Each structure stands twice: as C-alpha cells, then as structure tokens.
Amino acid sequence: MLLSLTQMLSSRASSRLFLVSYLLLWENVVSTSTCAEKDATIQDSLEKLLTLTTFMSQVVSSETAKLFTEFNNQYAQGKRYNDRIPGTCHTEFFDTPVNKEQSLVRTPETLLTLVHSLLNSWTNALNHLVNEMSTMQGDTSSLISKAREIQAKFDELTTGVKIVQSMIGERDIATYSAWSGLASLQSSNEDVRCFSFYTMIRCLLRDSRKVNTYLEVIKYKMVDQNNC
C-alpha cells in the first residue's frame, strides 16, 4: 500500500486526480453524520480518502523538512538563528494540541476543522514564500521548486479535508489566521530577509507536522476504531 501511494503522489497531476475522483464518487452518495451507521460503500470510500490524505500529509511534512534543511544549510550556517528570539508563528492563534496524546481527546470533527484552518492560513503565506524567495542571494531554484510542490500539496490536502467533511455531513466552519510577514521578506536588509524566511519555513514545518499528526488521529478514530 505504501509503495502504491508513493507512486500515486509522484506527480502533482496524479495526486490531484485521486482527490477529484473521490469527490466525483461522493456526489452520488448521500452524506451521513459521523456517528450514524454507514453502509459499506461510504465506509470504504472514507477509508480510502483518509488513507490517501494522511499519507499525503506525511509526504508534505517530509518535503517541508527537506526545504528547511536545505535553506538552513545554504543561508543560516554560522548565523546562530536558533539563539535569536524567534517570532511567533502566525498560526499561534489556534488552540492546537501539542502532541498525539492531546489530539486523541479531540473529536474527529474538531480536528478536521483545525486541520482545515491551518491549511487555509498558509494559502497566502505560501504564495509569497514562492514569489519572494528569488530575492535571496545565490541559486534559489531548488528551494523554489520544493516550495511550489509543498504549496500544490497543501491545496490538495485542503481539497481532501473538505471532501471528508462533506462525506460525514460536517458543516465547514474553518477559519484562518492572517499572515503579515511580507514586509520582512521584502526588507532591504539581507539578514532580516534571511531570518524571516528561516522563521517562516520553521513555522511551516511545525504546522505541517501538526497537520500530519491530526490526520493520523482522525484516521485512527474514524477508520481503525470506526467510532466518533
């Protein structure tokens, strides 16, 4: 199963195709509440989508870690950024469980809304991350390519989460936390720009790991335990 999912997610088009396929499949099925008894078709579709979405979140988390490592190696060596007082992430507004144990006490519906909100909060930020990174000194082509792939998969994850919410009859009440770091990314001071990118990618890594953890818990509760 892991190998086939890796192959499915090897290109942007293929992963989006699978999400759209599940969306089209769901248009022919009447939504039901999480706690209601589901027929085999609904449960099977839900399991497949959650498996795909959870694995995709693992891929995103891994790709974000690679982006952070590459940026750190290329721009942050010897600058002791870890010793500086870091700026807070723009998603600090959300009441997020800090680990899997805390996540397990939340309902799947609550976690789905939280995941959706976190993903929404990075839409604008990721767009600027991709567009502004070329202003850094040196060759940024690899960094930009990685950031674009992450941006695309965030969009696909958002689609997957919205489909899951529709499948369980959950009303979409996701919100977002506005990102306001553009001025720092466009600063004329190279060190300010560099530290801003460093902090931004660090926050992206933190949130991508949270999304992965929450989706794993959602899958555990809704598929492995088959309860609510």
Curated annotation (Swiss-Prot):
It holds the Pfam family Hormone_1. Residues 1-31 form the signal peptide. This is Prolactin-2B1. One of its GO terms (cellular component) is extracellular region. It is found in: Secreted. Belongs to the somatotropin/prolactin family. Keywords: Disulfide bond, Hormone, Secreted, Signal. Expressed specifically in placenta. Expressed at high levels in trophoblast cells from both junctional and labyrinth zones of the chorioallantoic placenta the last week of gestation. SUPFAM superfamilies: 4-helical cytokines. Disulfide bonds join 89-194, 203-228.
